Design a protein with these regions (language model features):
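Feature primarily recognizes SF3-like P-loop helicase cores of small DNA viruses
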Residues: 111-133, 188-191, 217-220, 226-255, ...
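Short, well-ordered alpha-helical packing segments
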Residues: 4, 174-177, 207-211, 239-240, ...
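P-loop NTPase catalytic core of nucleic-acid-dependent motor ATPases
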Residues: 126-236
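N-terminal nucleic-acid engagement/recognition segments and initiation subdomains in replication
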Residues: 46-153, 160-167
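Modules that initiate DNA replication and primer synthesis
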Residues: 1-52
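Short, hydrophobic/amphipathic alpha-helical patches that form generic packing surfaces
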Residues: 1-9, 18-19, 122-123, 137, ...
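Structural motif
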Residues: 1, 10-11, 130, 160-168, ...
Length: 335
C-alpha cells in the first residue's frame, strides 16, 4: 500500500499523512487517514531500508540534484553550445569543453556520485538544460524608451555630405533589430551600409560599437565567401557581419554575396549533423573600405548604402545601448 512504500522509502509518518491528503482524493476524515498510516508504521519493519524507486531512478535523481546544486547550465541557441558556470559564483558563462566535462565528473565522484562522462553528456544534451536566447534576453529586459532619438545621434557620428544617410541608417538599423526578434521571416535585411574613407577614420570600430557588450560575441569581421557553406552558417550564428575591406571581395564572389544578402533562411547541414535543416537567419551586414571605386555591378547596386566620409567617426562618447535598442523596439511595435 502507499503507506508501506513511504515507510520503506524512509519518509516520516507525518509527511506521509500530509502528502496523502494533498495529492489524493481520499475521504475528508483526517483521523481515518492518520490512523491507517499509523497502523502501517507501527507494524511494518525496515524503515528506510528499501526505496520504491529503481536503481536507475535513484541515480537520475542523485545526478540531477548534484548538477543543479553545483552548476548553472544553459543551451545557447546562437552558438548551439552548452554553457556553464559554478552556482553562487561571479563567473561568466563559458562553453563546456572536454576539460570542463572531466572536471564535473571528478567533482561528482569526490561527492560519492558514480557519474561518468557519458552520463554528464546525456544530461547536457537533454531538456534538463534550459534554452538561452541571447538576443531575446537582452531586448526583452530593456527599460521603456525615454523619447530621445538615439538612432539619429548614432548616425550623425558618421560625418558625410549625404543628406539621406540618417534616414537610410535608421531604416537599416530597425530592420536589423526586427530580424533579431523574428518580425519578418519572409525577407532578409538585404541592404548594407558601406562606409568609405581613409585609414584611421575608425570605421571598423564604429561597426563593432553597434552591438552592446552583452552581444559582442555575435559580431564578426572575418567571413570568407569562398567557403560558401560556412558563410551561410554565419547567417544563423552571428547578429552583425562586417565585410571589412570590402574591395578585397573578388568579382567571382560578388554573385554569391548578392545571393547571401537576400537569403531569408538558411537551408544547410550543421557541423556533425546528419541532415539538412532550416535555420533562422539573424545576421545583417555592414561594410567598410578605404577605396572609392567599389561597386562595379552594371545591373545596379541597390543593396549598398555607399557613404563617403568627410572625417573620422566619433567613437569617444559612450552609447546608451539600453535606450538605443528600447527606441528601436518602440518604433517597430508602434510605428
Amino acid at each position: 500500500c502507499l503507506a508501506e512504500h513511504c515507510f520503506r522509502a524512509g519518509i516520516p509518518e507525518e509527511d506521509t499523512v500530509r502528502w496523502t491528503k494533498a495529492h489524493y482524493r481520499l475521504p475528508s476524515d483526517e483521523l481515518l487517514i492518520r490512523e491507517t498510516v499509523k497502523s502501517v508504521y507501527r507494524t511494518a519493519k525496515g524503515f528506510g531500508k528499501k526505496s520504491s524507486l529503481t536503481a536507475e531512478q535513484l541515480f537520475a535523481m542523485q545526478m540531477d540534484e548534484f548538477m543543479k546544486r553545483r552548476y548553472e547550465f544553459r543551451y545557447n541557441a546562437l552558438t548551439t553550445e552548452v554553457e556553464y558556470r559554478e552556482r553562487h559564483s561571479f563567473n561568466y558563462f563559458r562553453p563546456v569543453d572536454k576539460r570542463v566535462l572531466a572536471s564535473i565528473t571528478m567533482n561528482a565522484m569526490c561527492e560519492g556520485v558514480k557519474m561518468w562522462d557519458r552520463d554528464v553528456i546525456r544530461y547536457l544534451d537533454s531538456d534538463h538544460v534550459p534554452i538561452y536566447h541571447p538576443v531575446e534576453d537582452f531586448l526583452y529586459h530593456l527599460p521603456r524608451w525615454d523619447g530621445k532619438d538615439r538612432i539619429l545621434e548614432l548616425a550623425n557620428r558618421v560625418p558625410c555630405d549625404n543628406p539621406h544617410w540618417a534616414p537610410l541608417f535608421r531604416r537599416w538599423f530597425l530592420s536589423m533589430t526586427a530580424h533579431w526578434i523574428g518580425m519578418d521571416k519572409r525577407h532578409a535585411n538585404s541592404t548594407s551600409p558601406l562606409l568609405i574613407g581613409p585609414q584611421a577614420y575608425r570605421k571598423s570600430t564604429f561597426c563593432r560599437m553597434l552591438l552592446p557588450p552583452a552581444l559582442q560575441a555575435y559580431y564578426t569581421d572575418s567571413i570568407d565567401f569562398s567557403r560558401k557553406r560556412d558563410a551561410e552558417l554565419y547567417l544563423n550564428r552571428f547578429l552583425l557581419i562586417n565585410m571589412d575591406e570590402f574591395d578585397q571581395i573578388s568579382p567571382t564572389q560578388q554573385a554569391f554575396l548578392k545571393h547571401i544578402l537576400q537569403k531569408p533562411v538558411v537551408n544547410t547541414r550543421r557541423p556533425n549533423a546528419s541532415a539538412v535543416e532550416e535555420l533562422r537567419r539573424y545576421a545583417s551586414f555592414i561594410a567598410t573600405s578605404n577605396h572609392r571605386d567599389l561597386l562595379t555591378d552594371t545591373s545596379g547596386s541597390r543593396r549598398f548604402i555607399g557613404i563617403y566620409m568627410t572625417g573620422g567617426i566619433d567613437v569617444s562618447r559612450p552609447i546608451d545601448y539600453e535606450q538605443l535598442y528600447a527606441q528601436a523596439l518602440e518604433l517597430l511595435y508602434h510605428n
